[in-house]
Amino acid sequence: MHKQLHVYYSGAVQGIGFRFTAENIAGRLGVSGWVKNLHDGRVEILAEGEEESLKGLLEELSSCFSRYIRQADTQWNEPANRFKDFRIEF
């Protein structure tokens, strides 16, 4: 089932390659959307795709960055179908 995933990651998640890794994983899993750093030190992801692919994105990011992630605030929504690819927003 196609879903939208909105996540805010907090912890020491900036300056460690988090966004680039998210972009690579999302591309491999066929997930669209974006990832960006926030001014308060968090990283935000808004992604759409098959639910299993989105869960895979969460699991792989958690596996890669578990020592840096303090908290992941996750919300599942209905997709807006407005993304063609996954990119880093600046």
What are these model-derived regions, one by one?
Residues M1-F90:
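Intrinsically disordered, low-complexity, mixed-charge
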